[in-house]
């Protein structure tokens, strides 16, 4: 997977691509925090999909898109009893799956797992913009089984 970003005062954008199992590639782009658009790129007899993708990558780089080196650790924390229950662990796994989808399709980052014990349960995410990601997550969790979180916080700021 290749992820490129362009952050200006006016707009924050992402562009990413990944290989699919069938030999095609998916290209996904948009404004950071939105689902954006996507397309499938398939090769032909005369042109491999990698060449088509490389041309797009070159265009994006010439337009100011770059990989982002710095990611922020965003944690979603829940209060639990003691070391937690089987149901708590299952809920954490469902939330991890949801965050992988939510953050990935919004161009924000990915979920990296979680932890449980000593009265709290956390889901760990790596994101390129903490404030945008926090806002997207708050909206995504509202009205779901996951809305009862204690806090969403930036680990490095603690």
Report each predicted region and the residues it spans.
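Short, intrinsically disordered low-complexity segments
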Residues: 106-135
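Short aromatic-glycine-(Arg/Gly/Cys) micro-motifs in beta-strand/loop hairpins
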Residues: 13-40, 97-117
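Charged, amphipathic alpha-helical regulatory modules used
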Residues: 91-96, 112, 155-157
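Conserved short beta-strand edge segments in small beta-sheet-based binding/regulatory domains
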Residues: 66-67, 143-158
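A short, exposed loop/beta-hairpin motif centered on an aromatic-Gly-Thr core
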Residues: 34-48, 121-126
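Short, hydrophobic/aromatic-rich segments at coil-to-beta transitions
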Residues: 1-6
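A short, charged, amphipathic alpha-helix used as a generic interaction element across diverse proteins
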Residues: 44-61, 134-141
């Amino acid at each position: 997977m290749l992820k490129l970003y362009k952050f200006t005062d006016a707009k924050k954008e992402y562009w990413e691509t990944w290989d699919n199992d069938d030999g095609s590639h998916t290209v996904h782009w948009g404004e950071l925090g939105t689902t954006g658009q996507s397309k499938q790129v398939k090769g032909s007899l005369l042109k491999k999909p990698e060449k088509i993708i490389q041309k797009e990558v070159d265009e994006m780089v010439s337009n100011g898109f770059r990989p982002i080196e710095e990611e922020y650790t965003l944690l979603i924390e829940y209060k639990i009893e003691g070391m937690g229950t089987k149901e708590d662990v299952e809920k954490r796994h469902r939330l991890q799956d949801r965050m992988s989808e939510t953050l990935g399709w919004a161009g924000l980052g990915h979920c990296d797992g979680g932890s449980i014990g000593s009265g709290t349960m956390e889901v760990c995410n790596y994101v390129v913009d903490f404030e945008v990601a926090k806002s997207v997550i708050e909206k995504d969790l509202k009205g779901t089984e996951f809305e009862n979180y204690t806090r969403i916080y930036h680990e490095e700021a603690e």
